[in-house]
């Protein structure tokens, strides 16, 4: 093998470490822990940021990937900023032989350093990246096919272990466009080549990448994100999280998949903004042993992380004191909870579980965002613990919010996302397109430089979503254009609360019901994944709940009695808390409810499967 004389790697004690890049004279590069780091707003592109990190901090660790397949205790592979930069340049040279300006390049690779090299290589080539998940062996993924058909990439980047599976998708990627995309295994390129590289900053289009939405209610759509969108949103995120743009966390820890907007931002892009380190692991490694997340936060002194609500729940349930022995979380500054409904009870359990290891409650940050706004829109002000309010269900059902008479009452407990953000946010009547008064539920509209340019080659959907105009806006509020998020929210006591999705709203017996609230009630009983759907019947729509129920070791009549007991408890709890009748409670095995690649329940698929009697019911005889 030809070794790169600019950055030579060697293995030692289950970790890949890196020698100094030439020209640094063996000088010690100071770590960034506790240092003042300025956000680089003068840089106009992600490639500018990568170049700056590589030249200013060549020997600083950029990305550490902890591989638990190689070693159950974790095998650490590290790339410095100089290494990642040179390897991305080598990938870029390869890509220039296959693609022209404006072409798309899809990345379908396992979670790992090769994925990062591939993604950054696309940007260094001046092309448009399309981050996607790697296909599962032997299973055709229609959503990957749909994203490839929509983006029509000229090249697909992958790795040698999965190239055969990925190649099966290539013929569908340019159906009707002519030509099949080239499939390139990044790990088979001579990434350690000693040859001289052209380090001239690349010419690039304004578009950095296409972020395909998870598509819980429709086919995935490619959100067109510019370099400006992404850099702006990084700065917004750090400013809203920390209340400053000078001191930034040094180490990010993430198990989120790179193809997901939050995983891409936290795991790959934010470290370039901070010019610091990301500690990364495979999502499956987290799911197998959730304790690994908090262990890495303690071991590597991670200061920022993020996860959906279920990640917090798993960490609470499956992390022991022994797992955390000798570890301290007092340095953690922000762990965001987003990408799905935030359950206040889950956050409190998380805070209580890790408080003995010095985790501050102010570090837990409920966060709202969506791919159409790059990823992040709002969080509460820094320095305060999560706040929640218990809202009366009956008021919510008619589009207003009122506190429950007392905290012990059954109600919708919602978290606050604060009152001051770097994005413009308004609550709007989606029909009249006028701003809603405080206390009235409406659609969340967003405005700012983080809002994407639109959907890839979908002008009709782009106009409906990104070009909304307000009628008679209040003083200081622009007419538009505004991003229509499709999310429902309300301003209460000056703060933002999110109630659900417009498309998910259930109308049963003439009243509005938020499925998230009903699902939260059931989860307090069963602890597993739940979906609440409305299914048409002769009198309108009926409420049906699909409930995943873990095996409990019972059999025969004892099992039947247990299932009946659970169904009665669920029916009673929903009737008492939400004043709505459940037409059917369907108990199914864990893993039965269809979800998107980011773990969100696919409600439309659930409804269709229920109508076709497609669920294998545990309660068939109960």
UniProtKB/Swiss-Prot annotation:
Pathway entry: Lipid metabolism; fatty acid biosynthesis
Keywords: ATP-binding, Fatty acid metabolism, Ligase, Lipid metabolism, Nucleotide-binding
Pfam family, one: AMP-dom_DIP2-like
Traits of the deletion mutant: Deletion of the gene leads to selective loss of phenolic glycolipids (PGL).
GO cellular component terms, semicolon-separated: plasma membrane
Function: Catalyzes the activation of long-chain fatty acids as acyl-adenylates (acyl-AMP), which are then transferred to the multifunctional polyketide synthase PpsA for further chain extension. Involved in the biosynthesis of phenolphthiocerol, which is an important intermediate in the biosynthesis of phenolic glycolipid (PGL), also called mycosid B.
Protein name in the entry: 4-hydroxyphenylalkanoate adenylyltransferase
Organism: Mycobacterium marinum (strain ATCC BAA-535 / M)
